[in-house]
Amino acid sequence: MNKSRIDKQNEVYNFIKLQIKEKGYPPSVREICKAVGLSSTSSVHFHLKRLEKEGLIKRDSSKTRAIEIVDPTSKKEVINVPIVGTITAGNPILAIENIEDVFPLPIDYVKNTKDLFMLKVSGESMIEAGILDGDLAIIEKTDSANNGDIVVALIDNEATLKRFFKESSYIRLQPENKSMKPIILENCKVLGRLVGIYRKY
């Protein structure tokens, strides 16, 4: 594409951005044509196709004014986090060590990208902490925890997601559901600490 066409394409792109910013909706093809001094609407369509091909805009040809600016930050770097079985957020179930799948998680979704894994939550014992049945819990691997941390704990080879409290002579794994009682233990193995939740709507 020659320089004049590139310049005109940039004019079209910048005009669309300006209109969306100022008015909240994109311009029509005729408005673009007039604003940037193109001779015909077919010339506008040519530039729109180029912008779409370059990933700068999205269009819906079945609708008028259906032009959307693609956020350049939407193409974010991701990390593939392993999904390790299914644990319970109710009664503990047998811990599953095999990796069932991997999940492409945006790298800016979590602070620490090392030693992460995900577990699918099953049950309602953590609903008052906003953790629902079917959520994917993002876990940072660690064998220690502070009071109040939500952890994945291993109890008799079974894993559970609970809030951790180290009392004077025992460990309390507290559900976030008033209808459920805490689990009291002399000791337990911490597998990891909750750092985030991913939920599909």
Swiss-Prot record:
Give the source's domain of life in one word: Bacteria
Q: Which reaction does it catalyse?
A: Hydrolysis of Ala-|-Gly bond in repressor LexA
Q: Mind telling me which SUPFAM superfamilies this protein's record contains?
A: LexA/Signal peptidase, Winged helix' DNA-binding domain
**Signal peptide from the UniProt entry:** none
The entry's function note states: Represses a number of genes involved in the response to DNA damage (SOS response), including recA and lexA. In the presence of single-stranded DNA, RecA interacts with LexA causing an autocatalytic cleavage which disrupts the DNA-binding part of LexA, leading to derepression of the SOS regulon and eventually DNA repair.
The enzyme's E.C. designation: 3.4.21.88
This protein is called LexA repressor
Keyword Transcription regulation applies: yes
Looking at the UniProt feature table, which residue ranges are given for the DNA-binding region?
Answer: 29-49
Which source organism?
Clostridium botulinum (strain Langeland / NCTC 10281 / Type F)
Residues the record marks as active site: 125 (for autocatalytic cleavage activity), 162 (for autocatalytic cleavage activity)
Residues at the site labelled Cleavage? 89-90
Q: Which GO terms describe its molecular function?
A: DNA binding; serine-type endopeptidase activity
Q: Name one GO biological process term.
A: DNA repair
**Enzyme class, one word?**
hydrolase
Q: Which residues form a coiled coil?
A: none
- UniProt keyword DNA-binding, yes or no: yes
> What sections of the protein cross the membrane?
none
Tell me the protein family, please. Belongs to the peptidase S24 family.
Question: How is the subunit organization of this protein annotated in UniProt?
Answer: Homodimer.
